[in-house]
Amino acid sequence: MSDGGRIRCVRTLDWCEPLEVAAGLAMRDGAICLLSDPALPGSRSFVAADPEWAVTLDEAEGGPFAGLTERDLSAGLIGLASYDAGARVATGPRPAVWPDLMMARYSAMLVFDHDAGEVRVIGWGQDASAANAACDLGETWMTAATSPGAPPPPAPALIPDADDSAYLDAVGEVVARIRAGDLFQANIARGWTAVLDPQADPFDVFVRLAQGGAAPYGAFWRLGDRALVSNSPELFLTLDAASRRVVTRPIKGTRPRDPDPVQDAANAADLLASAKDRAENLMIVDLMRNDLSRVCEAGSVRVENLFAPETLPTVHHLVSTVSGRLALEHGVADLVLASFPPGSITGAPKHQAMKVIAAHEPPRGPWCGSLFLLDEDANLTASVLIRTASFERVEGRWHVRTQAGAGIVADSDPAQELAETEVKIGALRRALTG
């Protein structure tokens, strides 16, 4: 975990809103905006464009990171690992809908420190002259900042893959398998598609999501004829490069927000009191503990917090925190591979849950995969790609796919799980169609 053998340049600049800087770069290839809720302590956002290199890997033997070195996984890197890349060990080959791994490394990156109210431009190069030139490039991005405006709804409709009865039947079948002892929990999802209006762009969806309510792990990324928009609340992994401390924060348990404060508080209290949701959360905590134990120092993995309530603009969640210390013989790729795909969006046991998911869903693509950043100090932050839409440009039009799922356990009610998916897709539906 390093600067990849490069020299680093750092300059401090006056504040500018990251969404405005991203708007000035949005149409450039490799444009990336990682937008964090400024109300969260220590939150930082990142903007960059024009990567020095980008790679796309499909069905790599040995997993999505096979053949990559720690030098490849260095500061200034953005990557996207698709869910199917990690699930293939359980499901076997399935039709490819998205690359296993997309990565790009940037020679410059803007870091927006919301607490300090300042922007740092980081530049990397093989020598001081190249690093300073990269910083100069980053400064030009700031001068291109522009208001993102208020884009109109970019899609006429969001079309479900199947009617509600198909999902109700799938949940019923999974509940039966759980009661028969095949597994304990599985996350079963529904899918929707749309085609953007001819003049619309995925960045319009990102702007509408961001203006509708900030998320801890908001993201927009454009690479060629593909783009990703995410409004994820969930942390998959962080790794502090200096201390080697690892943290994961799985989410399990959801209730809708309500405009009536009394009902909203009642919904949150109901979630906290729910034995079903707490059991569901605990199963995933145990799974993540086991995953981290494969690459962390013996005895270092512990549960720091169980069933903490977290309130977002559209939902209440239960979040738990698990930490550990990465063993010296392991690096970033080992950590991600040991715990990917995230347990919160598979189920338990993970291998069996992924088989059950494949029996009821088409390939997921980037949804429920992970978007990850290695920042200026090569610290890893990886989100879980829920509340996420993927875009592919076909004959000049952007085609959209998104999903929403629910954790199914032995006492799940199919109608309630269906309603939960509607709550979870709500923000993306409004961003796409109004």
What are these regions (language model features)?
Residues 1-434:
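Extended alpha-helical targeting/anchoring segments
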